[in-house]
Amino acid sequence: MKGQETRGFQSEVKQLLHLMIHSLYSNKEIFLRELISNASDAADKLRFRALSNPDLYEGDGELRVRVSFDKDKRTLTIADNGVGMNRDEVIDHLGTIAKSGTKSFLESMGSDQAKDSQLIGQFGVGFYSAFIVADKVTVRTRAAGDKPENGVFWESAGEGEYTVADITKNDRGTEITLHLREGEDEFLDDWRVRSIISKYSDHIALPVEIEKREEKDGETVISWEKINKAQALWTRNKSEIKDDEYNEFYKHIAHDFTDPLTWSHNRVEGKQEYTSLLYIPSQAPWDLWNRDHKHGLKLYVQRVFIMDDAEQFMPNYLRFVRGLIDSNDLPLNVSREILQDSTVTRNLRSALTKRVLQMLEKLAKDDAEKYQTFWKQFGLVLKEGPAEDHANQEAIAKLLRFASTHTDSSAQTVSLEDYVSRMKEGQEKIYYITADSYAAAKNSPHLELLRKKGIEVLLLSDRIDEWMMNYLTEFDGKAFQSVAKADESIEKLADEVDENAKEAEKVLEPFVERVKTLLGDRVKDVRLTHRLTDTPAIVTTDADEMSTQMAKLFAAAGQSVPEVKYIFELNPDHVLVKRTADTKDEAQFKEWVELLLDQALFAERGTLEDPNQFIRRMNQLLVS
């Protein structure tokens, strides 16, 4: 063969092949689904390119995929007449994996085969799944529109190298031949292959045909029998589609191995005409947080495939949604640039966003357990919503889940509707606290009075929470209030201070002034508080001041952070505060005030500028 060369696989391909062969073997029949799915994609791409260049059909516009086998040679062949590939595309698609982050993902894989199977499945194994059942794979392909002599041959045993060469191939498209491993003869059985095609490929619009051989007059006559329905699933009536068909179609378009959590199939007529089929996956893709992660819906216009990953139809906080939209209102020659500035696109995006939020609301209402699965996988992404989508903020807020003092668990199961339903008589605000961890939030001294009064507090410990709460200002007419900020509503919750206590506080006024003088401009103010029960002192910020958690976010992002000026609040009933107020020794007074402030700062920030001084003062207090 001309132009023959042997090349090495990209290292990620070798890792993937090894992991896949071992972890997916128990579900090995999926290789046929993957290869037929690829053939369907190749047909879609040809239809799209032929819109502007009909000559690409080369006189053969009947697109299909054909499956045949040779029992003597122990081979199974999947052939399509789709878009095909040239030599560069073969090397690019069959010798490398173009996803960024692949290497670190594969290196993180463990030895748990069930887990590995799910992870590799969502990764989208596609072509490489052939090696689960084959010890050698041969590919013959030619790109649509190329000359017959520009065909390409590719072959590999999946062990680190592959051979590529030039061949003559008269018909366009791709032909994949699997040389089956010993013990895989079930895939040479006509009934078995038919059943797999029916199971996995009924929803594909492309006809899938199987070879039929009949003896007539001493000769073998070959014909092709269509196995699948070959009608695009989303064009069918919902009442005729089984759940299994919806599940398999999801796996086809998402290249996932697990069933989706839920879906919504809708046909809209009127001002706009479109069909949408939207899925919520049950598992987050491994590269969800990768900047290069491709997301979006498959776009069809009047049943013609236009593009994958059309991100213009979903806001970023719903980037986990998979599915498709088939529009009658967009032009067939639509481009990503046209989509960006299209009124039709904006209207579709608005309608589809509302559809997804309604779907999630229904899931939360009908199946709390499934919704918890969704929340664990995608909750952090949904929390981007209040900042990104003000128009749907109330609907998004209903879908948020939090840990709270009501449940005494770190599980985020409490909805805002749950919280509001439990609000105490006279309570006007929704109280929350943000912290680095659930434990830090739960045990914060800011909660002491609220806990004593039986008032629920939402415990927020995800990094995104502080940023989210800057945009989420109210729910159901109730304002959100951080308990780490100075607020009159919290002070009002304290019991009425009796006359004797008021007199005692008057006595402490000189002490407060003394502390102010000592600390100077290191704090914004010093005051007595009734919001503490067990703790001697805390620091709080004014409502308009940057919070501690927000300052941490800025610092982590490498941005300059303005100095946070805290209000130093002292508990007049605490023995340490009383003892400090009574001391006449100025040096000791200074040490104890500094110690109280350090304690409060440490509880608030989790760090101190000078921890050694804090330790020295603590040691000194312990031995005094």
Swiss-Prot record:
This protein's encoding gene: htpG
Ranges where the record places region B: 337-552
Compartments in which it is found: Cytoplasm
Function of the protein: Molecular chaperone. Has ATPase activity.
Coiled coil: none
Assembly with partners or alone: Homodimer.
Keywords (A to Z) from UniProt: ATP-binding, Chaperone, Cytoplasm, Nucleotide-binding, Stress response
Keyword Hydrolase: no
Family: Belongs to the heat shock protein 90 family.
HAMAP family: HSP90
Keyword Nucleotide-binding included in the entry's annotation: yes
SMART domains: HATPase_c
Organism: Salmonella choleraesuis (strain SC-B67)
One Gene Ontology term, aspect cellular component: cytoplasm
Protein's name in the database: Chaperone protein HtpG
PANTHER family reported in the protein's UniProt record: HEAT SHOCK PROTEIN 90 FAMILY MEMBER
A, as annotated region: 1-336
Cross-referenced Pfam families: HATPase_c_3 (PF13589), HSP90 (PF00183)
High-level lineage: Bacteria, Pseudomonadati, Pseudomonadota, Gammaproteobacteria, Enterobacterales
Main location group: cytoplasm
Highest taxon of the lineage: Bacteria
